[in-house]
């Protein structure tokens, strides 16, 4: 059974594997990210990175010719997403910089 997700038809098992990978691999990192204060710059950065993550997933699916992306690749995408978000905060010296710097040391 297929549903439309971000303009593409994907199987329900694909959507479930995305949810499982997100909670399994990046839960701790995303918890620290989601606790940050949401000002306009940070929200814009999150939306931009979500778009990039989604595009990267579908480009990889097309390149590989796979109907369903594997969980390990999605976990790598989640790690890439979180790292990119943290790097954005550091580069732009946002108010959350000190918290991100502390999290990176741990």
From Swiss-Prot:
Domain of life from the UniProt record: Eukaryota
Other facts noted in the record for this chain: Partially overlaps YLR040C.
Protein name: Putative uncharacterized protein YLR041W
Organism: Saccharomyces cerevisiae (strain ATCC 204508 / S288c)
């Amino acid at each position: 059974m297929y549903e439309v997700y971000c303009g593409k038809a994907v199987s329900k098992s694909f959507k479930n594997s995305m949810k499982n990978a997100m909670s399994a691999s990046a839960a701790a990192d995303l918890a620290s990210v989601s606790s940050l204060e949401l000002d306009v710059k940070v929200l814009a950065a999150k939306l931009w990175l979500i778009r990039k993550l989604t595009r990267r997933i579908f480009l990889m699916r097309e390149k590989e010719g796979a109907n369903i992306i594997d969980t390990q690749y999605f976990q790598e995408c989640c790690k890439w997403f979180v790292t990119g978000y943290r790097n954005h905060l550091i580069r732009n010296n946002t108010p959350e910089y000190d918290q991100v710097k502390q999290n990176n040391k741990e």
